[in-house]
Amino acid sequence: MTSPSHASDRGGGDGDSVENQSPELRKDPVTNRWVIFSPARAKRPTDFKSKSPQNPNPKPSSCPFCIGREQECAPELFRVPDHDPNWKLRVIENLYPALSRNLETQSTQPETGTSRTIVGFGFHDVVIESPVHSIQLSDIDPVGIGDILIAYKKRINQIAQHDSINYIQVFKNQGASAGASMSHSHSQMMALPVVPPTVSSRLDGTKDYFEETGKCCLCEAKSKHFVIDESSHFVSVAPFAATYPFEIWIIPKDHSSHFHHLDDVKAVDLGGLLKLMLQKIAKQLNDPPYNYMIHTSPLKVTESQLPYTHWFLQIVPQLSGVGGFEIGTGCYINPVFPEDVAKVMREVSLT
């Protein structure tokens, strides 16, 4: 990876207008993707605001995720606390799953190098993050968010017992334009029989960087110019070649390739930093819809086999759409440099 350039090096110091900042292409070794930074196409970093309305909250009486309406949901997998009618969170099957958990016996057919179809076996679950309809994830305290993260871990460990599953994606869609069909705060997990191509590309990119430098590029991503905040065990950064404006990554300080190795103490610590980032995003960007994704490693590869990669949590505020150029090339245009994002977000005060 090319060494991150500072604002002063690219003619975009604090005193320069956006129009005077030169465009720049950066390649991200993690995603293996080129990004065009073109500040002249946009406004000042501090002027970014969401114009997308959150999806309207239905009345609690019509929401099956609210406490007391459990019978309207798909089957429950577990709740926290266990067997408690006054639950704090529930993990349930998705009522409209993208994959079927009932096809496992058919999924044992061997996949060959020429296979173009395999049976659609997998798991698609929903994590209901609060019993109260009006509470969003950023309203929950760090311990409560830690409980949600540990619920992800517990469910990953359960699903990992199925030999046909190779990768599990944890993700959250907050707001209608971010893909949420329910306004009650929730996240989702999808367990796949294949390793998705973006995951393979991420592993290849981080491996190439490691072989070239002897270092993990995600460990290297924590340069001070890109750091927003940090906790005891995690650091939040605006990544060097951010695909999206105001994209944020939360990275463990210790090298770790699999999210489900997270312990209880680190879960609470991560919960605090995730809460802080969501609160800062909401304040600075006018409470935009957002997605977060946990990027981890395939289940069947051990920690010792992956000295070159690192799990992380990616937050993407929905501030701009994807056009024909991005779809056609896989190369994205970002109107704000991550150094500027980091500076703006560091200075956001919640008091």
From Swiss-Prot:
It is an enzyme of class 2 (transferase). Its cofactor is Zn(2+). GO terms for molecular function: ADP binding; nucleotidyltransferase activity; ribose-5-phosphate adenylyltransferase activity; UDP-glucose:hexose-1-phosphate uridylyltransferase activity; zinc ion binding. Gene3D superfamilies: HIT-like. Keywords: Carbohydrate metabolism, Glucose metabolism, Metal-binding, Nucleotidyltransferase, Transferase, Zinc. Its EC number is 2.7.7.-. PANTHER family: ADP-GLUCOSE PHOSPHORYLASE. Belongs to the galactose-1-phosphate uridylyltransferase type 1 family. Catalyzes the conversion of ADP-glucose and inorganic phosphate (Pi) into glucose-1-phosphate and ADP. Does not possess galactose-1-phosphate uridylyltransferase activity. This is ADP-glucose phosphorylase. It comes from Arabidopsis thaliana (Mouse-ear cress).
